[in-house]
Amino acid sequence: YVGKWFPPRKRVDYIVVLGSGLIDGKVPPLLAGRVDAALRYAARQKRKTGREPCLIMSGGQGADEPRPEAEAMREYAMEKGYPAELVLTETQSKNTKENFLYSKRVAEAHSEGKPYCCIYATSDYHLLRAGLYAGRAGFSCDGVGGRTAGYYLPNALLREYIAYVVMNKKRYLTIAAVVFALSLTLWGGLALLAWFARML
């Protein structure tokens, strides 16, 4: 939630908007919150600098979706009045990691190899894990979060926690192994002390 309350203040060239599931081929409230967060940042930047960033809508087509998420997101942003020429799409990704990998390619191709600055927009509960994936993809950018409806938040946080554990499973397995080994050592030491006590 840090990115929600303390959004980046720098001027950016690109905002990567992370996709999520469509409903009947349309942008549902959860995904709309992500696009709206990007639009708010872009509007604030335009007021301050007179320059609007490009939006990179990132999301492929799920097995149960009639079209790529990025296309629906682009349509939504344009309906909100954002210039069509400033809305790019990335339609190959299937998960957050791929969102950043493929969006980075889009930004690099569009910028023609010139240095650029970017941020990403996602749901507020998703900011931390998304930022970790951005770093792993070599995509250095901060994040801004869209509001998540209260009724959906408990489920979202639980899913996010599980995904975070899976993402860092090697670290957690190592910690679990160390704790288990220490527990066995402690138990063995106590058992040995108890044996000596009985022998006295």
Locate the predicted segments by residue:
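Hydrophobic core of alpha-helical transmembrane segments in multi-pass integral membrane proteins
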Residues: A177-G189
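Accessory recognition modules or surfaces
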Residues: Y152-M167
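Juxtamembrane/start-of-transmembrane alpha-helix segments at the extracytoplasmic/lumenal side
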Residues: A163-V179
